[in-house]
C-alpha cells in the first residue's frame, strides 16, 4: 500500500471537517463545492448523490485492500466496485452523510482522494505490467515518487486545468505517455538509462499527440521535468477560458519551437533553484521457474518463465459485490503472494500467477471477458455524469448482448471505446 505523508493526510482531514460544516453552513458549502472535485468528489446527475475517487498510485492494491473497498461499496455505495480508466476505484451513489463516513473510514486506513480530480495533478499513470514484463526498467517507483512529490506541494492543485502525467516502461507501452500533458518514456542510450520526455498532448476536444520535449533526461532527474512543465503551465495557462486551458493550447499558441524553448527555460530554472534528484534502485525479482501453460485469452507471460499475469475485465469496469466477493475468496485460496494492479482500461491485472494454478484460476474468472470485444471500455455516461450526452454503458451492454451467442464472430471483433461526450474519458480518439 502506498504510504501518504502526514501533510497529505492532515490536508485530507481538514477537507473532511469542511465537508461536515458544509452541511450546516451555506458559505462553507459554497467553499466546499468549489474545491470538492480536487478531492476526487463529483456530483452525480439527477441523483442528489456523489461519486468519490480515492487515489491508488500505480493502481497497486492487495487482496485485503480490495476486500476493504468491496465492503465499503456494499455498505455505503450502490452495490458495485467501479474500476476506472486512470487506475483508480470509484465509489458511486454516496449521499453527503455517507460521503463523510466513507472519507473518514478511508482516512483511518491511510487513504486519500486529494488531487484525484478537478484542476489538479491527476493520478500518475504507470503501465500495469511494469515490473513484471520485459522492459527498460520498472517505472512504478518513479510514479510513486511523483505522487509523493505533488501531494507535498500545494501548487500542484488549483492549476489552470488538469495536469496529467504518464510513465511508460518501454516503447511498446508508450501510447499513454504520448497523449499526456507530460510523458516520461523509459529509454537506454549508450548504456545509460533515463527518460525521453514528451509534452503537451491530450485527448478530448482538440486532441493532440505529445511532442518530444527532450530526447534524454537522466532517470534521477524526472522530478525536474514534472516541476518545469507545471511552472510553464502556471505561467501561461489560460484561466479565463476553461475550454482552452490545457497545456496543449499553450503549444498551439506559441508553436513547437517556442514551446520547447519555454520548457527548457523553466527546466534550467528548476535545476538552478531546486535540488530534486531522486536515485531509485532497479529491482529485479528472480523467481523459481514453474510449468508453462498454453496461451489462453487475457493471460500474459512475465519475464520469469512460468509466471503469468491475467487481465480481468468486468463489463464497463463494474464489479458487482457478488462477483467481487467470489473473486476475493478464490484469490485467497491461492497459496502464494499475488500482485493486483488496476489498469487504465477499467480492468484489473492479477500478477505473479504460477502455471500450476492456471486451470483452477480459469474457473474462477470464467464469467469475465474472453476476447477483445468483451474488453471494451465505456465511460460513466449520461445517467451518472453531468457532462454526458450518451448513455455509453448501456450502449456497450446492448452491443455485448447482441454478440453474446455469436462467439465465432465476436472473437474476431476489436475492442470498442465509447465516450458519452467529446471529453474522451474512454480514450476513443
Regions found by a protein language model. Give the residues of each.
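N-terminal basic/disordered segments at the start of proteins
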Residues: 1-65, 173, 181-184, 190-191, ...
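Mobile "lid/hinge" segments at catalytic clefts and subdomain interfaces of large enzymes
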Residues: 2-4, 157-261, 429
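Generic structural signal of hydrophobic/aromatic residues within well-ordered alpha-helices
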Residues: 5-6, 12-20, 35, 146, ...
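Small-residue-enriched alpha-helical segments and adjacent helix-cap loops
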Residues: 21-27, 49-194, 224, 310, ...
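Short amphipathic beta-strand starts and helix->beta connectors
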Residues: 35-41, 68-78, 199, 231-234, ...
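Short, flexible, solvent-exposed loop/turn segments with mixed acidic/basic and small polar residues
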Residues: 41-46, 77-83, 235-240, 299-304, ...
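Terminal amphipathic helices with adjacent charged low-complexity linkers/tails
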Residues: 97-98, 107-109, 234-296, 352, ...
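Acidic, glycine-rich loop-and-beta core segments that form the ion-binding/anion-interacting portion
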Residues: 265-346
